[in-house]
Amino acid sequence: MGLLDLFTTKLDVLLPDDLIWLTPEAKLKGIIAQVRGWLDKKRFVLVLAHFPTTLAKVEEGLSATGVPSEFHRRRLSRKDVAGLVDQAGQRKVLLVQAGSLPCDEFPMEINDTLEGLAILVAERHFVREKDDAIFSFGRTLGRPCELVFHLSLHDPLMKQFSGDWLNNVLHRLGMGESKAIEGKMVARQIKSAQANLSSGLLSDRPANSAEEWLRLNVPSMSV
């Protein structure tokens, strides 16, 4: 593919607004429901998380509700995904650490005749570029791809701007735990919070959880 082709071919993955839940429990239920829905449509599902603790909680929730899944513990390449998606009759849920995705592959034109897949991310990172890397990975697959991020108001990133006031307002407006919040305004707030956190970043030391990452790398904003 030439440079000009990058601006004239179909490259983008489907990226709906983030789904934001009132509580971690509601988020997990929403994740499980969406995974089930995709499996019912015979789709291959890739579940990602930036932190091991988050991915373990999702795996536990899927297992408890009878949704089979498996961990992929090594680096996941574009070729790996193609082989897994194209396995006849093998519709599965693969759990992967987001950091194991390659970031050095070029985007490919989407071939609509190929089997598609869904990518669900169980959190957003404090550093926007790490989320963008997942989107970039989806663009390298060359097949139909839907990418959805799930968050809760209790996520450390969300606490940087939401606080208890937003939770209380939503409850007064009749917002139930079974319904997710969507909207461009919240998306802008998330992006702004990520930019603010990145400006105070001292390091990028690995961590098992979002809370630990914040304490290690941006202690001034630890919640």
How would you name each of these model-derived features?
Residues 52-56, 74-79, 99-106, 123-130, ...:
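Short acidic, S/G/P-rich loop/turn micro-motifs used as interaction or catalytic elements
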Residues 70-117:
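Conserved motor-coupling elements within RecA-like helicase/translocase cores
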Residues 1-14:
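A short, basic N-terminal segment
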Residues 69-82, 96-97, 146-154, 176-188:
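A generic structural motif
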Residues 46-50, 71-73, 94-99, 119-124, ...:
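Conserved beta-strand segments of the P-loop GTPase G domain that flank and frequently precede/overlap
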Residues 162, 167-223:
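Non-catalytic, charged low-complexity extensions flanking SF2 helicase motor domains
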Residues 122, 126, 130-181:
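Conserved segment of the helicase C-terminal RecA-like domain
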Residues 12-63:
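Conserved interdomain hinge at the start of the Helicase C-terminal
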